[in-house]
Amino acid sequence: SLAMAMTYKWAFLNVPMGGAKAGIFAVPEELKCERSDLREAFGRGLKSLVAQGVYFPGLDLGTTLEDLYSIMEGAGRPLVGEQIDGSHATALTVFETARQVVKYSHRELSDVRVGIEGFGKVASAVAELLAGSGAIIIGVSTIDGMISSENGLDVQTLLSLKNEFGDRLVHHYPAVEVTAPESLYSLDVDLLIPGARPRVINEKNVSSIEAKWIVPIANAPATWEAEKSLDEMGILFIPDFVANCGGILSSAMRSDYFDLEDVRYLVETTFAELVFALLQESELRGESFKEFVRAVTWQNHLMLSDPSTGFPGMRKRLPQLIKDRDWHGVKSRIGYRIHRRNPKSNGVIHQSALDRYAELTLGSMIN
C-alpha cells in the first residue's frame, strides 16, 4: 500500500515515475553500530538499482537530509549541490490542501479546530503554518500520549518542548492531562491530520471520529473499510497522494534546478488551484472526492506508462495547451529550455520556466 501511494503521487504530479518504498528496521545501539553505518550499508545494497535508474531513495518517516546524503554516498551517487528539505515541502502541500478544503467549505481557517497526530518535522511545520493562519490546535498526539485544550495549545511552546524532549513533549506541556495517543481521533475537531503510521484509522475507531475533514501527512492512514465508513459518515477524506505529495514534488523540481521558494510558489498557485478544481468537479459529478481523484490520477498513470505519449503525455495535450496559452505558452517553453541550460537564470526567464514546469505537471490536470 505504501508503494502504491508513491505510484499515485507521481501520477498525480503528472511525472512519469513508478512508486516504491523501502526502509531500515533496526536499532543501531542493539547492533553496536552508528546510524551512519546503517545508512551507508543500505545505500550499498541499493547500488545496482540506483546505477540502473530503477530506484531513487528519498526522505520519509524518521529520516533527514543527512540520512539521504549518507545513503547516496553508499550507493555510489553522492548528492551534489544544495538539496530541498522534502519535509518542509510536504508540510506546504498538507497545509495548502487543508486551506483549500476549508475555503471550499465556505469556512475560515481562523475558526477551524485541529487535531494533529505526531509532532515530527512535517507535523510540527504544519502546526506552525496552521497556527500562523489563525487555526486553533486543539490536540496533539505522539507515541507517548495525547494532550488537548479547548482553548487551543500554544504551538511555540510545543515546538520548544519538542526540541528538548522529543515525543515526550506531551508530558511537559503545562496544565493538561496526558491521555492515550488514540484518544486524538475522538476529539471534537473540524480538521484531523493523521501524521504518523499507516492504517491508524480503522474499523475499531472510525465510528468515533468527530472531524469534518481528514487531511493526512501519513501515507495510507486509513484502511479501505474505514475509508468507506468515512464516506457514509459524510467526512471528507483527502487521499495521501494529494495532501502529502510535496516531498516528491520538491525532489522532482530539484532535478529541474528549482529551489524551495519555487516549490512554495507552485504549491500556493497551481497546486492550490488544482485541489479546489478537483473538489468542485467531484461534487458536480456527485462522486466522493477520494474515488474521483483516484480515478483521474490512475488515468494519468496509464497515460504516463504509454511510451507513445512522451513526457508527460504531452503529445496528446500539447496542441490544446498551445491553443489555450498562446504567446504565454511559447514564452514559457522558451524560458524552460533556457533554464535547463542555465539554471542560474533569473527574472522573467526563471518565472517562465517555472510556469512551464507547472503546465507540464500539475497544470495539465487542470486542463
Protein language model features and the residues they cover:
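N-terminal ligand-binding/catalytic initiation module
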Residues: 1-85, 325, 331-337, 341
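Short glycine/serine/threonine-rich phosphate/pyrophosphate-binding segments
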Residues: 122-126, 200-203, 222-224, 245-247
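Adenosine-phosphate binding glycine-rich loop
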Residues: 212-367
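General beta-strand structural signal in soluble alpha/beta enzymes
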Residues: 54-60, 79-81, 139-142, 193-194, ...
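Buried hydrophobic packing segments
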Residues: 2, 94-102, 126, 248-252, ...
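Rossmann-like adenosine-cofactor binding region
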Residues: 145-238
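Glycine-rich phosphate/diphosphate-binding loop of Rossmann-like nucleotide-binding domains
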Residues: 85-186
